[in-house]
């Protein structure tokens, strides 16, 4: 069995139904369920007595009140059921397109939601768990293009992925692991329609799929890969044509280029849903051996289809106007990561600070740790092994011993800098700092008290800011002087924090519109880290972050200048096209 041929005319005749179905599912999730579950999670967190949830307080949060923890578990399980239902509704809709029975738009929706209700009544924990694991882990392509909100939160932050990819053998191991997951997904893919569409247990559905793919793994892997490739090719080819047209339009007057840009934005969104429809129909047709029916055109149906498409185009046009005409909702601050830019020296050293300050970033982010003798030194890592080749912690050596050590990075060699020297030189250069306090179990109990007593006045006078992963640091700073801006670093976007921090420094790959909207409502600032790629930059601009922490200051500055002074609509459309696919890091 292979994929059935799918004529473009038949696909076009059903595009309006797909648009209608996705619009309804989107409205239910975006404006009903996501706000509700977000409110519920925040309410439960408040009952624990904690203001935030992060890796360093998760155990304390979930052990604070067992009744609340039970409610957290229930909310988590309900969200899994909602994700299962969201996928199921879409599958039922596509299945109804493959039926031989012709339906009106209302009949299509009625049948889809009726079948989805039956599917939900048949749901069992084993079915939900299988679908969540399949879509969330084994075949993440599905959850990405279908934009399954809660499954898309199952991702590894980009800074961890980048680290793993930079380790040669780990990179190879990850590639092999991803290939194995794909092959497992192929072995189990025929179980998916059985679970959704038939009243059989998961065990039998899995056995059916294993039997069907036995000794034909490469055959089915090729067919699934071909469906994915053709779907993405349709989208990519359409986007290339639109971008080519927009490049020409950008040479004309701004009014003409903006008008054509909005028109291309509409076509891009339609191309995305066309690609999505193509993939879903081909995928389910492949799994069920059913083809999309070619019904005779009824009188009046083109008008209804035209009306649905017209409304969709008007919505897309409004979205396109906002996206293209206001590419930068806020002008983000440019922040050098660890005091370097484009590998211009060794991180967290005075020599690199002097070079980076010439680029005039708004802030230079740097890292401070306590030493054995209660002084403060510039160091990011928990040990000295990477930079100095010594397996010691900064807290195990005195400041004098540390500043005598040679450190190496990016082809440069220098000495470790003390915080006193670094701060003094930054003040001389007129360079504001974003001072990150790194804490450890070896720190003295009065570390922050001594730090603030010695440096707080200078930090305030020169307009420096502070940040930390440790919320005790945030509390100490605010108790000492509420006028010092201090940011709480969050490596992962979970429950929205309700803290007294001036703002949040968030790992960019887990950021989403829901978090940013709440930031604006709470009158806090948002910094994103670490932004080094075109996709990450585009996402940060789109979300409207207040600051961008980067390893390449000049690149971010040029990107901001271009969007402010001479925005190229072709570039914006290209960024949006990538964003629509919603792959990790976008």
Each predicted region: which residue ranges?
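Hydrophobic alpha-helical membrane segments
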Residues: 1-334
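Phosphate-group recognition and catalysis centered on beta-loop-alpha active-site segments
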Residues: 290-586
């Amino acid at each position: 069995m292979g994929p059935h041929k799918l004529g473009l005319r038949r696909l076009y005749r059903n595009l309006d139904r797909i648009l209608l179905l996705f619009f309804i599912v989107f409205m239910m999730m975006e404006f009903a369920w996501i706000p509700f579950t977000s409110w519920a999670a925040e309410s439960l967190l408040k009952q624990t007595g904690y203001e935030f949830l992060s890796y360093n307080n998760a155990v304390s949060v979930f052990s604070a009140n067992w009744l609340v923890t039970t409610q957290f578990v229930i909310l988590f399980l309900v969200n899994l059921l909602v994700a299962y239902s969201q996928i199921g509704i879409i599958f039922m809709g596509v299945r109804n397109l493959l039926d031989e029975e012709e339906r009106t738009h209302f009949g299509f929706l009625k049948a889809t939601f009726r079948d989805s209700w039956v599917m939900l009544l048949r749901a069992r924990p084993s079915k939900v768990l299988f679908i969540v694991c399949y879509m969330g882990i084994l075949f993440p392509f599905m959850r990405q293009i279908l934009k399954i909100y809660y499954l898309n939160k199952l991702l590894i932050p980009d800074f961890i992925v980048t680290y793993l990819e930079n380790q040669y053998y780990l990179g190879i191991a990850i590639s092999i692991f991803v290939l194995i997951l794909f092959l497992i997904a192929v072995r189990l893919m025929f179980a998916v329609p059985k679970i959704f569409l038939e009243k059989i247990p998961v065990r039998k559905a899995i056995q059916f799929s294993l039997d069907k793919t036995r000794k034909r793994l490469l055959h089915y892997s090729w067919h699934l890969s071909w469906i994915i490739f053709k779907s993405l090719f349709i989208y990519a080819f359409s986007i290339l044509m639109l971008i080519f047209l927009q490049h020409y339009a950008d040479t004309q007057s701004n009014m003409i280029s903006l008008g054509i840009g909005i028109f291309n934005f509409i076509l891009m969104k339609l191309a995305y849903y066309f690609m999505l429809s193509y993939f879903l129909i081909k995928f389910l047709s492949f799994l069920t051996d059913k083809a999309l029916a070619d019904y005779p055109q009824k009188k009046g149906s083109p008008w209804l289809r035209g009306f649905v498409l017209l409304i969709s185009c008007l919505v897309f046009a409004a979205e396109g106007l906002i996206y293209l005409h206001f590419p930068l909702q806020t002008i983000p601050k440019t922040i050098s990561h660890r005091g370097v830019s484009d590998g211009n020296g060794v991180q967290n050293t005075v020599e690199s600070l002097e070079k980076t300050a010439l680029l005039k970033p708004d802030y230079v982010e740097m890292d401070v740790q306590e030493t054995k003798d209660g002084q403060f030194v510039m160091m990011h890592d928990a040990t000295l092994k990477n930079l100095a080749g010594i397996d010691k912690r900064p807290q195990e050596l005195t400041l004098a011993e540390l500043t005598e050590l040679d450190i190496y990075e990016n082809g440069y060699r220098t000495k470790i800098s003390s915080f006193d020297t670094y701060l003094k030189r930054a003040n001389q250069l007129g360079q504001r700092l974003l001072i990150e306090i790194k804490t450890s179990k070896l720190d003295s109990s009065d570390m922050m008290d001594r730090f603030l007593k010695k440096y707080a006045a200078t930090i305030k006078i020169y307009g420096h800011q502070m940040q930390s992963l440790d919320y005790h640091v945030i509390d100490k700073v605010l108790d000492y002087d509420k006028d010092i801006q201090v940011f709480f670093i969050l490596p992962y976007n979970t429950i929205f924090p309700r803290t007294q921090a001036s703002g949040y420094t968030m790992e960019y790959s887990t950021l989403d519109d829901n978090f940013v909207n709440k930031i604006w409502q709470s009158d806090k600032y948002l910094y994103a880290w670490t932004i080094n790629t075109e996709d990450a930059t585009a996402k940060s601009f789109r979300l409207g972050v207040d600051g961008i922490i980067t390893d390449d200051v000049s690149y971010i500055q040029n990107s901001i200048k271009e969007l402010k002074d001479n925005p190229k609509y072709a570039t914006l459309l290209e960024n949006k096209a990538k964003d629509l696919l919603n792959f990790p890091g976008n």
